[in-house]
């Protein structure tokens, strides 16, 4: 019933997530025919913190030949949580492809997540390489991620890296004093 779909969209846009979910449940047959439905339904599930349902639904609708940011992100995170890093990286790499259509995230989210996947596998060199792949547009964020990776690996230059970050005159990184202090006290 098309009215349930539209009522679900309106409810989601108005912030009535429970109502949106109830309407979307009634039109599950759209999942194989309408990608916008899949996006809205996954977002609704996440907002309702129905993560297991969101993971399961994403697996059902995911295909190799269709880029679906929300599904790739969720399936990548699910694989990461389960320590299946190779599979997680497959999904995270797709985020870089998807982000080419959205210049705000181009090569950002996927590379940062892959860097942390590499870090979780103990691969310091590759994790830092993936952070370096992030476009210069995000240099403030890559600086912080680089510091956190160095902290994660307990690198010798971690303290120096945090100090350089905090002393940056172009941007106020003073809130990272907290991380430096915690790093130094442990």
Which positions does each model-derived feature cover?
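Alpha-helical repeat scaffolds
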Residues: 21-25, 51-64, 86-99, 123-136, ...
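Alpha-helical protein-protein interaction modules
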Residues: 166, 177-178, 184-186
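Residue-level signature for tetratricopeptide repeat
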Residues: 10, 44, 78, 117, ...
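Mid-chain, structured segments of secreted extracytoplasmic proteins
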Residues: 33-80
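Generic helix N-cap/helix-start motif at coil->alpha-helix transitions
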Residues: 1-4, 31-38, 65-74, 102-113, ...
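Structural motif corresponding to the intra-repeat A-B loop/turn of tetratricopeptide repeats
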Residues: 14, 48, 82, 121, ...
């Amino acid at each position: 019933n098309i009215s349930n779909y539209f009522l679900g969209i309106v409810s989601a846009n108005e912030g009535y997530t429970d109502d949106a979910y109830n309407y979307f449940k009634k039109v599950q047959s759209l999942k194989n025919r309408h990608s916008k439905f899949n996006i809205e339904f996954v977002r609704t599930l996440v907002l309702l913190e129905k993560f297991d349902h969101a993971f399961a639904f994403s697996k059902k609708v995911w295909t190799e030949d269709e880029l679906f940011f929300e599904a790739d992100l969720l399936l990548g995170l699910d694989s990461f949580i389960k320590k299946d890093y190779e599979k997680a990286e497959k999904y995270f790499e797709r985020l870089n492809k998807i982000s080419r259509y959205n210049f705000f995230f181009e090569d950002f989210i996927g590379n940062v997540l892959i860097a942390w996947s590499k870090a979780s596998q103990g691969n310091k060199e590759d994790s830092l390489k993936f952070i370096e792949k992030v476009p210069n547009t995000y240099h403030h964020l890559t600086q912080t991620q680089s510091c956190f990776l160095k902290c994660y690996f307990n690198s010798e230059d971690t303290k120096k890296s945090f100090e350089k970050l905090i002393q940056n005159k172009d941007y106020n990184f003073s809130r990272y004093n907290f991380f430096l202090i915690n790093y130094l006290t442990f």
